[in-house]
Amino acid sequence: MEKEPKTMLRFGTIGTGWISNSYVDGALDSGLWQLTAVYSRTKEKGLAFAAPYGVKTVFTDLEEMAATDKIDAVYIASPNKLHIEQARVFLEHGKHVICEKPLSAHAKDVAELQALAKERGLIYLEAIMFMHLSLIHISEPTR
């Protein structure tokens, strides 16, 4: 029996700092993700981040990036205060969102975007490493 080929998830990243490199490297190592776009406030920084990954598409306009058909999802690693509005833009354009912590300082904002994602059949989640949470380690002996 032949296995179905794995579908690559095309994603873009917002943010060009070290955490973005770390996330992108892990995503690419999985063999399931393809970095296809980068957003930065300046074209120069965006191009510098994109070059080692062979990415040619760099945006300086979020709406433009959200509207592109070159991505299925976005990874948000911008300053915390921008997370909610940036996530909203991408969810409204039908893109899955993975956002660095915190999603927001306000639970009502998160609940609103969770509802929007659910309504549109999208994934909206916080990029958090569960394996390092104490709850995971506490539960391990019971497995």
Language model regions located:
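Helix C-cap/helix->beta junction micro-motif
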Residues: 53, 93, 119-120
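Aromatic/hydrophobic pocket-lining residues that form π-stacking "cages" and hydrophobic walls in ligand
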Residues: 46, 86, 113, 138-139
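Beta-loop-alpha module in the N-terminal Rossmann-like domain of NAD(P)-dependent dehydrogenases
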Residues: 56-114
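N-terminal Rossmann-like dinucleotide-binding module
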Residues: 1-53
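Rossmann-fold dehydrogenase core element
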Residues: 112-129
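Hydrophobic residues in well-ordered beta-strands that form the structural core
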Residues: 20, 59, 99, 124-126
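Short active-site oxyanion
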Residues: 34-37, 72-74, 124
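Residue-level detector of conserved catalytic or cofactor/ligand-binding positions
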Residues: 134-143
